[in-house]
């Protein structure tokens, strides 16, 4: 992808650009183009490292499968993103990059001026955090129901609500999203705390 980006910018804009797929703040702050591999649901949560983005930077969100991420109510840190499927033809990818770069050149607001309290990133409710923590540990619905003193039906209801909120469609996608949340250590801080409390018990 980085080689393709370099070729596109030289051919279309006669520019040499800085590209990063490293999610460290110093790398993000220097990059003209940020390449992110997105798992299902990940587009809806906060990514604090993106707050370091410089003005007019472009994000390429790379995804797999037929389920394209939606542009509705994206978190502010994903401003100026274009979605690219890994199986798309190179010609289409080039066009997307061209139009995305042209569009982000007109941005006038610096990323650090975005107000996080106005952001529409999604989080888990306290009860969903508890259910998600147990699923992340590998507990079955019956076990979760017993531990939380709720019915199995209620456990499945919370699970469906989580999956609906983040537009995910399988247990694998749910586990992958929870893994991303834990790695980011920001979207649901109580998720990590709940896991620590469970380990102490």
Give names to the regions the model predicted.
Residues 1-111:
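N-terminal regulatory/sensing modules of transcriptional regulators
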Residues 85, 89, 120-124, 136:
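Short, well-structured alpha-helical patches and their helix-loop capping segments
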Residues 106-133:
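Regulatory hinge/linker segments at domain boundaries
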Residues 128-135, 162, 174:
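Short alpha-helical "packing" element that flanks the helix-turn-helix/winged-helix DNA-binding module
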Residues 135-139, 178:
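Short helix-to-turn junction characteristic of helix-turn-helix DNA-binding domains
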Residues 140-173:
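Recognition helix of helix-turn-helix DNA-binding domains
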Residues 163-201:
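Basic, Lys/Arg-enriched C-terminal extension of HTH/homeodomain DNA-binding domains
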């Amino acid at each position: 992808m980085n080689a393709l980006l370099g070729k596109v910018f030289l051919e279309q804009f006669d520019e040499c650009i800085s590209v990063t797929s490293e999610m460290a703040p110093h790398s993000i702050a220097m990059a003209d183009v940020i390449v992110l591999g997105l798992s299902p649901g990940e587009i809806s949560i906060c990514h604090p490292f993106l707050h370091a983005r410089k003005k007019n930077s472009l994000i390429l969100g790379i995804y797999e499968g037929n389920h394209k991420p939606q542009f509705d109510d994206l978190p502010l840190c994903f401003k100026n993103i274009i979605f690219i499927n890994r199986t798309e033809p190179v010609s289409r990818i080039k066009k997307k990059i061209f139009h995305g770069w042209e569009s982000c050149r007109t941005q006038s607001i610096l990323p650090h001026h975005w107000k996080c309290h106005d952001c529409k990133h999604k989080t888990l409710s306290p009860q969903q955090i508890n259910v998600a923590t147990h699923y992340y540990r590998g507990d079955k619905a019956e076990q979760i129901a017993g531990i939380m003193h709720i019915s199995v039906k209620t456990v499945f209801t919370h699970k469906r609500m989580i999956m609906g909120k983040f537009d995910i469609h399988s247990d694998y996608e749910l586990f992958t999203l929870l893994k991303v949340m834990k790695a980011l250590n920001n979207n649901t801080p109580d998720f990590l705390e709940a896991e620590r409390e469970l380990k102490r018990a």
